[in-house]
Regions:
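Short, compositionally stereotyped local motifs that mark structural "simplifiers"
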Residues: 7, 477-588, 598
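C-terminal motif of bacterial Sec signal peptides marking the signal peptidase cleavage site
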Residues: 14-15
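Aromatic, loop-rich ligand-recognition surfaces of beta-strand-rich domains
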Residues: 333, 340, 344, 348-351, ...
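Short beta-strand segments within Ig-like beta-sandwich modules, predominantly Fibronectin type-III
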Residues: 436-440, 514-522, 639-641
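Mature catalytic domains of secreted/periplasmic carbohydrate-active enzymes
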Residues: 19-390, 395-396, 408-410, 417, ...
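Ser/Thr-glycine-rich phosphate-binding loops at phosphate-binding pockets of nucleotides
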Residues: 91-94, 547, 624
């Protein structure tokens, strides 16, 4: 009898050991639709509507359907680019604040059915949906609750109109993965000819609970976005950045779309009652809609990569906008930029050094929750600790010394977001040295660290709302971002050269010859007061690869110049900062150069702010030796400056001058002349 009972007892104990209970969830937790959405991480926005043709960001509502007339519209081009960029879906502006709609809605005449496009028979939402389906992309719909065209906006009747249109969008086009409600609402507008200001109670007017219920009924799997959710929230800025500390938890009952002090809620709250994760939205240009004058302002690769790491790498999804142009195409420069970003992301995460490494935890919960699950590429398996064991660590042994600069960690957020503090260390001669530390992790956290050599690293989980529940740990060595260095000079003549990454070496030249690796290394700012051409390259010492060269042609430094004006802000016209500008009430700029120069021309940079004003269209340049007697030495126009507001270089016959005055004879919009930056040409 004993011989029978003993094996049975062992079998029972073994069975019990395998049945380790999972940890209790830490509320709130995501819904199934939120989990599916979180896995997308990266998708695109398409801003294309009446604003594209009125050249506005926010239309007033008085536009005419006849204005909407793209000449080469190709939604398949949009979908192809998004797919090649690695995006998982696209969201389109079905209706923006101006009220014009991109489908033949039976509830309004302010739509594509009364435009010349496709002879009034087109349905842009249908073309968009078909293109997305062809390329395997999920479909999202942006719908602005505010309508500056509709005569009933601000009245109960408008809410019926809004819900009728949502019903059209959510029943006629198949599965929708995200419905995007803008937080801007209420203000001046055309409103069917009333041409007035209408204010609404942003909390109660739209009857959001009923509207949300409608969306749930028609599209059960769709995420709803607004400032406050209910499924996904605005990150609180339009820069594409989440935060060092970003919680997916939100005090959902205290937040509503359009609330005035939303910024204090943007990072989420540790004690939030609802699971409403962040979505980081940003345009690939300054504006959301296409403007030809922004063709030179497409975000650079370093800017886009910073956005990637500060959004997806900080517990947020990333929504990048394409301002489709008047042809109906994503502009070539936008396509080039987004595909370069896609290639760089792929390069950065090409090899997971942790895949072949061994993992050992200071403790674990038992079978099914051990450290070897941390590199199995399966989000649904995870390592965790016994109940009450808040602090723990995981060692990663690569088996040999490796170089890395990225640490990726994912929490199994299906059981709630937990980690409040963690650190990364490397082993050096038997002791541990801290490399970096962080706060929240969430669905994904990516630490960007300096190039580090180590055979063993340790991740310490220091504090949390509950025991750590970690799904994946990845370690990567991202190649250096080899981009032309940024060369700048202060008015005092101090030149600085900055590479895209701090680990890169920089070499430069000022003699007109091309810079060469190993020759004339940049070690700090240096002085250049006279005209000079400075060129620079960035070099990755590990690979020997170099960036394309950067080049800047400087003329006289401006440290001794004086702007003759009673307006103290006039100095902004010569402060060597492209982001600043000065508005001249007298439509001119007068400068004392501090010495007589042999003037051979001048440069004028229009203001580079997002909303331009006062670009000089026609100019006159005058010179003087005493500041009293003036002579006009040239007069002309800055051709196409409205659409291409880049620095203008104007050469003149040589003239002696100590004082110069640039006069605006006409601006592009009739407003007072603005000066982004003024310079002289003396060589």
């Amino acid at each position: 009898m004993k011989k029978i009972l003993f094996p049975f007892l062992l079998l029972t104990l073994s069975f019990c050991k395998e049945k380790v209970a999972p940890p209790e969830p830490i509320l709130p937790v995501p819904s199934e639709r939120q989990i599916a959405w979180q896995e997308l991480q990266y998708y695109g926005f398409v801003h294309f509507n009446m604003n594209t043709f009125s050249d506005r960001e926010w239309g007033f509502g008085d536009e005419k359907p006849e204005q909407f007339n793209p000449t080469e519209l190709d939604a398949r081009q949009w979908a192809r680019i998004a797919k090649e960029a690695g995006m998982k879906g696209l969201i389109i502006t079905a209706k923006h604040h101006d009220g014009f709609v991109l489908w033949p809605s039976k509830y309004t005449e302010h739509s594509v059915k009364n435009s010349p496009w496709r002879d009034g028979k087109g349905d842009l939402i249908r073309e968009f949906v078909d293109a997305c389906r062809e390329y395997g992309l999920k479909v999202g719909i942006y719908y602005s609750p505010w309508d500056r065209n509709h005569p009933d906006y601000g009245k109960p009747e408008y809410i019926t109109y809004m819900r009728n249109q949502l019903t059209e969008l959510l029943t006629n086009y198949g599965e929708i993965y995200e419905v995007w409600f803008d937080g801007a609402n209420g203000g001046t507008g055309w409103y069917g000819g009333a041409n007035e200001e209408r204010k609404v109670d942003k909390f109660s007017y739209y009857g959001w609970p009923t509207t949300h219920e409608l969306v749930r009924t028609l599209q059960p799997g769709a995420m709803m976005f607004s400032d406050a959710g209910p499924d996904v929230r605005w990150v609180g800025n339009e820069d594409g950045f989440a935060y060092e500390t970003t919680w997916s938890n939100l005090m959902g009952d205290s937040v509503y779309a359009g609330m005035p002090d939303f910024d204090k809620w943007a990072t989420g709250q540790e004690n939030g009652t609802h699971w409403i994760p962040a979505e980081s939205d940003v345009s690939i240009r300054p504006g959301w809609y296409y403007h030809a004058y922004e063709d030179h302002k497409v975000k650079t690769l370093p800017e886009l990569m910073e956005i990637y790491y500060k959004s997806i790498g900080q517990n947020s999804s990333l929504l990048i906008n394409f301002p489709v142009d008047t042809r109906g195409l994503i502009h070539e420069k936008d396509e080039e930029a987004i595909l370069k970003m896609a290639a760089k992301v792929k390069e950065d995460f090409a090899v997971n050094l942790a895949k072949e490494a061994s993992f050992e935890a200071s403790t674990d919960r038992g079978k099914g929750y051990t450290a070897e699950l941390l590199n199995d590429a399966d989000f649904n398996t995870y390592w965790t600790t016994p109940d009450g064991q808040m602090q723990a660590s995981v060692e990663v042994d690569f088996g040999k010394s490796v170089s890395f600069n990225r640490l990726l960690i994912q929490e199994f957020v299906n059981l709630g977001q937990r980690v409040k503090a963690f650190s990364l260390e490397k082993e050096v001669n038997g002791t541990w040295e801290k490399i970096a530390e962080g706060t929240t992790i969430g669905y994904k956290r990516i630490l960007v660290v300096p190039d580090t050599e180590a055979q063993k690293i340790r991740i310490n989980f220091l504090d949390g709302k509950g025991i750590p529940v970690i799904s994946e740990i990845g370690v990567f060595s991202a190649p250096a971002l080899l981009y032309p260095p940024k060369i700048t000079r202060t008015p005092a003549g101090k030149v600085s050269i900055e590479a895209a990454e701090s680990d890169l070496e920089v070499y430069y030249s000022i003699d007109g010859n091309a810079p060469k690796a190993g020759q004339n290394a940049y070690s700090g700012e240096f002085e250049v007061l006279q005209p000079a051409t400075i060129q620079a390259i960035a070099v990755d010492s590990k690979t020997g690869k170099t960036s394309d060269p950067a080049r800047v042609d400087f003329d006289l430094a401006k440290g001794t110049w004086k702007v003759i004006s009673s307006d103290t802000l006039a100095i902004r016209a010569i402060d060597e900062r492209a982001t600043s500008y000065w508005t001249s009430k007298t439509n001119d700029l007068t400068i004392d150069l501090g010495q007589e120069v042999d003037l051979k021309g001048f440069t004028y940079l229009p203001m580079q702010a997002r909303y331009p004003s006062g670009y000089i269209a026609e100019y006159g340049l005058e010179v003087s030796n005493d500041g009293k007697s003036w002579k006009r030495v040239t007069q002309g126009e800055f051709s196409n400056i409205q659409n291409s507001p880049i620095e203008q270089w104007i050469k003149i016959d040589a003239a002696k001058a100590r004082f110069v005055r640039l006069k605006s004879l006409r601006t592009t919009d009739g407003n007072a002349a603005t000066f982004g930056e003024f310079g002289v040409i003396t060589r």
